[in-house]
Every structure is written in C-alpha cells, then in structure tokens.
Amino acid sequence: MTVDDRTLDTLTGEVVDLLQTLIRNECVNDGTPESGHETRNADVLRTVIEGPSVEVETLKVLPGRDSIVARLPGTDPHAPALMLMGHTDVVPVSPDGWKVDPFGGERIGNEIWGRGAVDMLNVTSSMAVTFRHIASSNRRYPGDIIYFGVADEEAGGGYGAKQLVRDRWDVLECDYVLTEYGGSPVVTNDGISVLLTTAEKGVCAQRIVVSGEPGHGSMPYRTDNAISKAAEIVRRIEDYDPGPRIDKLFESRIKGQGFDAELEAKLLDPGRVVEALAEMEPGLARNLHSCCHTSFSPNLISGGTKHNTIPDRVELTVDIRILPGETVHDAQQHLRDAIGPELMGSTEIEAIHDQTATESSTDSPLWSALTDAIQMTYPGARVLPSMVTGGTDARFFRERGVPSYGAGLLSADISLGEFMNRFHGHNERIDIESLRLTTKLWLDVLDRLWN
C-alpha cells in the first residue's frame, strides 16, 4: 500500500510511541520460566492491532508469557499468506554500562534509546502499526496477512515460537515469514548493497563431563585433578581450527561489503581468510569469522566441592554454532578431534541442543518483492542474502518449509558494524529515519508480493 509522506510521517510517529511503550514495559527474559513477563507487551500490541475486522487470539504457554496472533483475511483463499513476526522480549542489561535508563525509552535527538530498540522491538512496533493501518483502511490483498507478536525468542523459543509452531499451526499457518534481522545499507564503489537474512547457524551446545580422582588438596603431586584436565580441554578447544568454508552465501556477503579488491581476494581464499580477518575491525571480524567457520565457545564451567578437596568431576558447556549442512554428530566429532584421544578417555560428551542450521532460497515471490521495495528507497541497490550467526524464530518456520527472511530497512547513518554491535550491547538505540524506512518497506512489500 503506497502512502504519501504525510501519512508515513503519522505512521512513523505511532511506531515511535509504540516502541517507547514496549521498551518501558521491561519484558526482560533471563532464560528462566518466570522471567519475560511478555504479557505486558502482548496486551499493548492487542490494543494497537485489534479492531472491527481483526480478531486477536492470545496464545498461552506459561502464565505471564502470552503471545498474540491476528489474521487479516485475503480475497483469494488460494493466494499465499504472509506473516509479520516480531518478538516481544528483550535480554537483560548491565545498567552501569548505559548512559541513560535502559528502560526509559527516551528520545534523544532523532534516536530512541533503550533495550530492545534494535533487537527487535523496532521491527515488532513497525509491523504492528503497518498491520493496523491496513486493517483500518479496508484495503484487502489476495493473501492473508498475519501478525505474530511472540514471547521467549531470546531464550530459544521454548515458551514461544518453538512450541507454538508445533502445537498451534492451525492459527499460525502461513506461506512466507518476515522477521528480524536485516536491512543495513552498505555503500560500496559499485553502489549500495543491502543485506537481508536468509540463513542462520545451527545451535549444537555440548556438555563435557571431565572425570578425575578425589584426594586431599594438600597433596596435589601426581593426582588426577578434573579441573586441571578441564583447563587443558578448554585451551585445546580455544586453539582448535575446523577450517574455513567459503560457500556461495559467504561469497555473496563479502562481495556486497565493498572491500577493496585485495582484501576481498584474501577473504574468499580459504588459505588467507583468517590472516585477513586478523587485520580487520574486531566486531566485523568476529562476525565474518563465524560466518565461514563452525565456532566453539566454552561458556560455562562448574566443579569441585571444597577448597581442600581435589575435584573428581567438572562440567563444561561449549556453545557450538554449526554451518548449513552440518549435524550434531559433526559438532561432537570436532570436539573429539580438539580434545584428543588421551583426554577423551576420561571425558564424556552430551548434546544439550541439536538445532541444525536453516536456510531459505531467494527464489521466491517474497524475495522479489523485497528487492523491488528496497530499490524504491535505494535505487539500484543490490539486495544480497546473508547468514546470522545467532538464532531467530525464523528457524522454526524454515523447518516447516516456509521461506523466512530477516528484513527491515535502515538509514545510511548506521553502519553494518555499528548495527551489529548494538544487539545485546550497551546504549542500544535506533534512529527514527530507520523506523520510517522500515515501516515504508512493509507497505511497499505488500503492494508487490501478490503481483
């Protein structure tokens, strides 16, 4: 639905107000069942999107952790349905690192500050305002439009999309999904590239149990100390290199970044990519390294019973993110290779998560609609597929064969590196122009999808 500038200004103002409210509701998800309190945001979103032509259903998994879904019926029952999906929870903060109240939702200049401003209450808000605008205008498209405001994305979706896609497909059924994250314009010598998400790495966290022999802490000589062995295992995992994989998705990402020819050549060479990354800005280097490697991060360790007792058991949790095409068995074999046979004799490996990587093809009407819509704002822009190294709720839909893309459209004032650093970081914020462009994107996509 094409709108004039005045209408877009009004909608943007509504997005700003809604975003501020969602931030102030402080729906912090620390991973425990009793956290999140997403019902606060679900109730607000309900008041925004419900109306005479819209029925909103509350989806309950746990008390206080509501999700909501609403469907705007299309005119053609055979036309594909599009879901606009945004999560309503945010991650915890360290207040001492913030310049402002992280849950104040303050407007400072042309930016809205607060936890969730980029992850992803900005998108959740713009989608809700877009959905309400379409419903109130009485404009109908061939296919259904679904709004899904979902809880618990930040802790894996067990109380949100993961369970609801499994148990409530009757209300969530769709043919396409738009969600986080994407839309950063990258200025290159050849013009502008805009990266959208078509894939995400798999999560294969593993628990490593290291065994030893107990003894008195005053006599450590020639003892079998489980902590000492665990420390060596951590060192070996840190040093382990599974080798890079330069696939078409990574190649597309590199060619769209606008690097100079020499750096681009290094990044696309398996023998030189790590050398090239070592010379780059750390934030971008970390992201690109993870996009072409299976990654291993030892993040939790526990063991020992008393200061004077040699420990006989240590548990170590390693966050492993695998590339498309790899399995949990591949992840465990990497660990065995890293640890080595002499230490594997006193080590057990157990899978905690077994989530394979997911990827959607760009050969779809929705991708074409996104490309056309983005080029209305950034004429001639190359719209390129990319992979996120973390997880989103899109994976649960991709597993059902539903093409799912992470989208949005940011202003040129936010670099890709800065945008990535704001996720889960201090002083999270979004500029109002990006809220305007993202809202316009949804409207432009809807005008093009069924054409």
Name each region found by the language model:
Residues M1-V3, T10, A155, G182-I192, ...:
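Metal-dependent amide/peptide-bond hydrolase catalytic core
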Residues T2-P95, R313-T317, V328-Q332:
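N-terminal helical capping/dimerization or prosegment-like subdomains
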Residues L8, G74-D76, S136-Y141, W169-D170:
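Surface-exposed acidic, glycine-flexible loop patches that form ligand/cofactor-binding
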Residues C27, S67-V69, E111, G116-A117, ...:
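Cysteine-centered functional microenvironments
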Residues H78-G149, E428:
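Active-site metal-coordination/substrate-binding segment of hydrolases
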Residues M85-H87, G149, L178-E180, V209-S211, ...:
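Short beta-strand segments
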Residues L121-R139, G158-R166, A226-R236:
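Active-site-proximal alpha-helical scaffold in enzymes
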Residues V123, R140, G149-C204:
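Hydrophobic, small-residue-rich alpha-helical packing segments that form membrane-like cores
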